[in-house]
């Protein structure tokens, strides 16, 4: 519960793609992004990449890999242009660097929706103590 509170505090007043990512997740899944994915499994949240526990956790793993490929981007400060059209995320950003960030966020939001059947409530707030530190390569 403490982790969830900390994640909520971190998101308050934050601008940039972190907020846009949360909106995308809400639009794609209908779920509160902080509550359902803020500390899920071994890869969702601020800690480094670890071996994914399930398909939902793999979504976060792949999102971190996607962000790792970005150069000169700051997901906390940078924001991009996107819209929700006909129940689909459309990245409208002209800046190539920010468009890539938008595409990373879009991919994880869609991944969460496509893997909702693998979501394990027991992993919602994972302390990551028992997560294997050797991740697969991106």
Swiss-Prot record:
Its main location: secreted. CDD domains: PLA2c (cd00125). Keywords: Disulfide bond, Myotoxin, Secreted, Signal, Toxin. The keyword Secreted applies. The record marks 121, 124 as: Important residue of the cationic membrane-docking site (MDoS). It is found in: Secreted. Expressed by the venom gland. GO terms for cellular component: extracellular region. Residues 1-16 form the signal peptide. Residues 121-133 are annotated as: Important for membrane-damaging activities in eukaryotes and bacteria. It comes from the Eukaryota. Disulfide bonds join 42-131, 44-60, 59-111, 65-138, 66-104, 91-102. Transmembrane segments: none annotated. It holds the Pfam family Phospholip_A2_1. One of its GO terms (molecular function) is calcium ion binding. The record marks 130 as: Hydrophobic membrane-disruption site (MDiS). The keyword Nucleus does not apply. The record marks 128, 133 as: Cationic membrane-docking site (MDoS). GO terms for biological process: arachidonate secretion; lipid catabolic process; phospholipid metabolic process. Monomer. Belongs to the phospholipase A2 family. Group II subfamily. K49 sub-subfamily. Snake venom phospholipase A2 homolog that lacks catalytic activity. Induces mild local edema. Is myotoxic. A model of myotoxic mechanism has been proposed: an apo Lys49-PLA2 is activated by the entrance of a hydrophobic molecule (e.g. fatty acid) at the hydrophobic channel of the protein leading to a reorientation of a monomer. PANTHER family: BASIC PHOSPHOLIPASE A2 PA-11-LIKE, PHOSPHOLIPASE A2 FAMILY MEMBER. This is Basic phospholipase A2 homolog Tpu-K49b. It comes from Craspedocephalus puniceus (Flat-nosed pitviper).
